Each structure stands twice: as C-alpha cells, then as structure tokens.
Amino acid sequence: MSAPPQAPGAAARVAVLERRGKFLVAEPFFEAGPRLVVSRDRRADVGDLVVINPGTARNRRGAGRATVARRLGRPDVARDVIEALMIDRGLRRGFDPAVEHEVRDLVELDPTAEALQGAGRRDLRSMPTFTIDPATARDFDDAISAAAEDDGSARMWVHIADVSAYVRPRSLVDREAYRRGTSVYVPGAVEPMLPTALSNNACSLVPGQDRPTVTVEMQIDGDRIRSSSFYRSLIRSDERLDYGRVDQIFDGSANASEPWGAALDVARKVAAALGARRALQSAVELESTEPEFEFDRKGNVTAAAPAEQTESHRLIEHLMIAANEQVAALLEARKVPTLYRVHEPPDGPAAQRLIDQLASLGVPTPPVPRGSMTPQQAADVIGSASQLLERWIASHDGRGRRGLTSLVLRSLKQAHYDNRNLGHSGLQSSSYCHFTSPIRRYPDLICHRALVSAVAGDGPAPDAGWVASAAPWTSAREREAMSIERGADDIALCFILEQRLFEQGSDQVFEGEVVGVIGA
C-alpha cells in the first residue's frame, strides 16, 4: 500500500458570506485569498461561515461562480469556528458510505464468534478488569488487571483492544484508517481514525461487554519486569473508572469496590515502582501544559483550565510504557517488521544551552560532564534537568510551567516513527513502540499485526518495504494532527479572552507568563 493522496475535500475553502453590492461573495476566513462570487443558496445567509466549492455552479446565470457546499454556522461561535478549521485543514468529518457499510458488517459479529477468535485466544472474562480514562472519553482501548503473587512479586495484564481482529489489511476501513493515520482531538470534537461504530462500540472496552483484546502479561518483581508473554484474549471489563475518581480513591475520599479494588491497589504499587526506576534512569519528566475547555449547548466556550497530571494519569502512563517496551523488545528480537517509536539522543550543545538557560532563571540544574558531552550524556543531563524542573515548578505553585517546559522540549529532537529501532532517548528505552492505542493511532495497529503474527501465527507479518514507507507517512499525519489541535486550542482561548474583555471591559488587567522571547 503506497501513501494515499490527500483528502479530496482538501481543496474546499472555508469562507464567510458577505454582500458586495448586488453580489454575494465568499471572504476567505483563515488565510488571505481572492474573494469569490457565490451563487445564491437558501441554506446560508450573509454572515454565515460556509464551505464553498470554487467555480462549480452549472446554471447559465451562475456559470463559473462558487457554490455553497455546507453551512458550518456563525463565526462568533467557538465550536463552529473549530469545525471550520478542521475542514479547512482537509479533515473529512465523516466516512464514505462504502466504508460505513463494511463496518456495519463487522460490528454485527459477536465478540465470541469464530471469525474473531484467531489462534489460541484466551478467555479472561472472569479476571477482575478495569479501565481508567478521562471522564469525557468515548473510546476505551486499554484495560488493566493485576494480582499479587505469593512470592511478593506482582502479575500485570495490560489488555489492548484487538482492532486487528476487525480491521483487516487492505480492507476499505483499513485503507481509510491508514490515510488518516491518527485521530484528531480538538476542543469539543474529534475526527476519529476509525468509524465510531468501531472506535466507540465494537472495539471499545466498555464495562460489562465481551471484547476481543491483545494482552501483555508481565511478572514484575519490585521495579523489574521478570518475564512477559503475549496473546490474544477475550475480556469483560468490570468497571469504567475515570482519572478523577481514581485520584479520590487514592486520597481516601472515595472507596474502591470489588472485584477490581484489590487489582487497582496492586497496579498502583507496580506503577509507582516502575516510575521510580524511570526517574533513576534520567527519563525526561514533563507534565502536560495542554488546556481543557468547557462549552455550553450553543457551542460557546465557557471555561478553560490547564490539564492536570495526577497520580492516576501516571499510573496508566507507566503501565502503558512498560507494555510498549515489552512488545518492541519481542518484535526486535524476532526481527518482525514493525514501526518503532524512536527519539534520537539530543546534541551536547543543546543540553548545555538548556542548563545555561535554566540556571539563568534560578532553576536548579544537575551537574554537567566536563568537555564535550556524548549524546547519551546529553540525554542524561536533560532528563535529570527535567525532573529537577518539575519539582521546582511544583514548589512554586505551577508558575512558569509552560515557558520552562518549552525550553526542555526545544532541547530535544522530535520523536517519530521508523522501521528501524533507534531507541527512545526521552524514555531512556532501548526498544520502544506504540502498541497501546490502536483505536486512534495507525502505527499501533501495525504493531498489533506484527505481534499476533509473531506469537499466534495469525496472518502474515507486515511487509518490510511497506512498513518502511508507512513510517514517514504516519509521522507526517501525527505532526499534521498536532498542528490542527494546537490551532483549535488557540481559537478556543481567543474566544475566552474575547468573552472576558466584553464582560469586564478592555481596561482589565490579566496575569500571564512569558513563554518565549522573539527578536525585536
């Protein structure tokens, strides 16, 4: 499968309709461009935000004029503008009927049906299992089971939705998922990689429903993974937990229930041990600075707050990292073609520049080796600096997080996908892949197919040449999605600022932080 072309809808333009004399014209909304005369359309009025198709009018009077393809809403409604951004950047906002038809046939399959079983799928439905996700999540692609062993060790099961059981190579839905590469999450909306019948239903690990999964089983002694095994499985989640509820259980303000309460306690201890080991290895430690937004029913953004990273977030993070590392190590050892998540080591000068910048701002820094730093030494220095920075920010009530975090990120190279295992410097991992989110990332689906071919013999391994071509394609789709998500965040923040200025007056004083410096 070669890299597919851009979405057919990418040529459509987003504009605002305006009246210019006797003509109805489309004024480009996001970027400068020529105004286009538009054929009249009863679906849209002057001032509306619309998608137009240039020069597609067919009647004699309107020949050569643009036509309204879709009315999006109003330019003074945040949700409408974010929707417009997604379309302007080429997102389809839906699936072709042929893809939807293919998916309807897939979701009608019973999870226990022979067509979904594959070779040696283990029945784990009696095992206490739970999910932990954001309160607003709709697609649940990972679940956890855990148990304490008599010898003091622990056994962890990380169950990941078996998307590969439904989405077969070169099927219509597979081609469309590859074209998209990833789901795109913006405030109040999502452009899913898979149709919602799969992402929110058949593949989603909702409680009380049988679901096919791929399981990574790990025996963990302290902070060391003693052994691991991999197999297809069938689970039934007992509880859908969210981060807030888990944090309440951890701080004692809420109670856990059985059958999942004991498993959660074991998982908490295991995750803490794995996290402590990562810290000792100088893994980069940075909390997210992404904002979260609230909307009213009309689509107006009403509130914004920075996303908080808590112990419950870190629990899932550490367990997913462990599973990803184990899968990557197995695939590398067996030389199965797959996509690795690689993060090449930073340069010594970049590490030294970061240390100098942090020190000039009064932030504690780690010792730096004398002379020129090797890439590994640079990675160790930046990782240690990030951990000291996180503690310093926490002691200052979170002030300066966004600007200081950006300094660390700029000192690092950008992570990407590669068919070669080049290691993951930020995590200090010798082998790493993305395996735990196949509902929303295509590279994870590639890893699933590689893994089940290696351990279960279910289908051929991905073709090595095709995997090599998929690496730059999926990396580009990820960067594109991040650009759209950041643009949507900026739009929502602008609406919040506009609302406060309107309600409180333009003479208001706002507190802020310097997050960067540009030349004069």
Regions found by a protein language model. Give the residues of each.
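Structured C-terminal cores of nucleic-acid metabolism proteins
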Residues: 326, 348, 358-520
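Residue-level "edge-of-site" marker
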Residues: 99, 344, 371-372
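Charged, low-complexity, helix-prone segments enriched in Lys/Glu/Asp/Gln
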Residues: 3-5, 78, 82-85, 102-107, ...
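A short, sequence-level motif marking secondary-structure junctions
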Residues: 40-44, 70-73, 231-237, 308-311, ...
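Short, charge-rich amphipathic segments
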Residues: 91, 95-96, 104-110, 203-208, ...
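Feature marking long nucleic-acid-engaging regions of large polymerase/nuclease enzymes
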Residues: 34-36, 133-366, 417, 422-459
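Exposed alpha-helical structural elements
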Residues: 67, 81, 98, 102, ...
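Charge-lined substrate channels and their catalytic hotspots, especially those that engage the 3′ end
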Residues: 1-157, 164-210, 240-241, 245, ...
